Amino acid sequence: DTPHLLNAEYIRLQYPEHVKVYEATSPDKAAQEGVALVREGHADVLMKGIINTDNLLRAVLNKEHGLLPQGNVLSHITVAQIPTYNKLLFFSDAAVIPRPTLAQFEAMLKYDLEVCRRLGISEPRVALIHCTEKINEKFPHTLDYAVLKERAASGAYGSMFLDGPMDVKTACDAHSGEVKGISSPVVGHADLLTANAVAITCNGRGVRHT
C-alpha cells in the first residue's frame, strides 16, 4: 500500500547507490522475487517485511525455485542482546519445527553451531532446555538430549560444550546452578538455548518483552 511504498522510496533516496526497489503485485510475488534474487547471487540476505510468514516460506520451500536443498532441514535462530547478560544469547528453534525428531534436532544443532562460530564464538556453550533437569522417559524429548550429549562428548560437533536438560535460569545464571548443585561449563554461561519450538518461543518472547 501507499505508506509502505513511500517508505521504500525514502530508503532508496537515502542510499541510491546501494538500494534497488522491485515492484511486486502481491505478497507471494514479492517473496518469489526476493528468493530469486538470492538464488541468482544478487542478494546475500533474505529479510521478511510486512508479508506473512506463510507467503515467504512458500517461496523459500518451493521445490523447483526455492532455497532449501532437497533433504535439508529449515530451522530458525534468534540472536538477542540482553542488557543483563554479558554476551549475545542465541535461541533455536522458535518458529519452524514445533517438535523436531532427533535427526531434525541434530541438523538444527549443527546449523546453530555454525552461526555461533561465524559470529566469533569458537567454543559455543549449548544448553538443552526443559522443565526437568534429568533424563526421563516420561519426557521423550529428554531422551533425544541424552543422544545429543553422547555424540557431543565423542566430538561429533567439534569444539563445544553441551549439557542439559536444564531450565533457562540455570543456563544463564551461575548462582542458580550452584544452589541446585549442578556443575557444568554451560551453567551460567550458555551461548545457545535450544529446545522444541513451543518452549523456545515462550522464552524468546519473554526475553524480548523483559
Model-derived regions, located:
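Anion-binding alpha/beta catalytic cores of soluble intermediary-metabolism enzymes, centered on
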Residues: 2-185, 189-196, 200-210
